[in-house]
Amino acid sequence: MQHLSRTVSPALPHPCLRALRAAFPQTIPVLAGYFVLGLGYGIYVQSLGLPVWMPMLMGTVVYGGSLEFVLASLLLGAFSPLSAFLMALMIQARHLFYGLAMLERYKGYGWRSFYMIFAMSDETFSITCSATPPEGVDKGWFMFFITLLDQLYWVGSAGLGAALGTVLPFSTEGVDFVMTAMFTVIFLNQWEKDQQHGSALIGLAVPLVCLMVFLSLIHI
């Protein structure tokens, strides 16, 4: 009796799993950056005397990076909704333009669109604009997992930093300078990379003008 050989093709992984596998390598640079910044943020929040869970809560609900550094100090000051609103608007206004740029890209993905809009950070915006999912990978799930992984990196690193802040044997004074240092390095890299320094100078001038304008409004 002749036996017919049958070739059984292996089952393909679930579309979500394929998208997750494709998205993870795209987010490794973000993981490296968020790990350092998140640790600094968590240690900073802990040094202010706030609860260990606070940086994780703000990373989940606010997820605003530099805004979270400012909010941590605002929580210890006098209650001033107008000041908090103006400060948040000044820091995060760029996300209004991010959202406009991503309207078509995020269209048609149901509940995932709402989450991706909420959790769109600078780094996530950059990746989702430039990265292309491999063949056979659902684009919606691909962008969703990029967004989710980036936020998980930040929340986890902030929580770890807060936990370490409770046991660190040295003073954490000055750790809030980490964000200033990061933006200084970005400015210097931009200055060295481009022969034309117009964009770097604009990036330096705009925050200074906004700082003067918003501070004058706050103290009116």
Go through the PLM ranges and name each one.
Residues I218-I220:
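Conserved small/polar residues in nucleotide/adenosyl-binding loops
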Residues M1-R21:
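Short, Lys/Arg-rich, polar N-terminal cytosolic tail immediately upstream
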Residues L12, F85-D176:
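Helix-loop-helix junctions within the multi-pass membrane cores of secondary transporters/permeases
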Residues V36, G159, G174-I186, L201, ...:
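Hydrophobic alpha-helical segments embedded in the membrane of multi-pass proteins
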Residues L39-I43, T60, V70, I127, ...:
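Alpha-helical transmembrane segments of multipass membrane proteins
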